[in-house]
Amino acid sequence: MSRRHVAEKRIILPDMKYNSILLSRFINNIMKAGKKAVAEKIVYSAFNKIEKKHSVDPYQTFNNAMHNVKPHLEVTSVRVGGANYQVPTHVDERRGYALASRWIINAASKRSEKMMIDKLAEELFEAANNRGVAIKKKEDIHKMAEANKAFSHFSPKKMK
């Protein structure tokens, strides 16, 4: 029997403006050093920038971006007979959105614009339109899963 304690999942309250748990998680991922007010300001300012520049609903753009970047497959490393295989596995919804938000934030922070507000606004808009670095990351993950399709019979769920 495992002695390891499984951490309970924390209840994340929805954000104040759009009443969305997904957006609240995204804000939490943006947050650095516990400065949630700064993270909220960055996200909401980016939403305002999207609305002014492209005249589209920023919340709908955010949802489209998250849905477009969310991966359906990923590879996990499985050891079989002394060899490690990259086995494609399905990504559950919660992990998919967590990966999507991480990829969007990383892609935004590496952009050339000066302020994070501008970087995030542009990356979200591009991801909503199936362009950008975050979408490329998802496509690379899917290509890797497709390339290792031959090892899918080593699926970790079947091994147990």
UniProtKB/Swiss-Prot annotation:
One of the primary rRNA binding proteins, it binds directly to 16S rRNA where it nucleates assembly of the head domain of the 30S subunit. Is located at the subunit interface close to the decoding center, probably blocks exit of the E-site tRNA. Keywords: Ribonucleoprotein, Ribosomal protein, RNA-binding, rRNA-binding, tRNA-binding. This is Small ribosomal subunit protein uS7. Belongs to the universal ribosomal protein uS7 family. It comes from Rickettsia typhi (strain ATCC VR-144 / Wilmington). Pfam families: Ribosomal_S7. It comes from the Bacteria. GO terms for molecular function: rRNA binding; structural constituent of ribosome; tRNA binding. The gene is rpsG. SUPFAM superfamilies: Ribosomal protein S7. GO terms for biological process: translation. GO terms for cellular component: small ribosomal subunit.
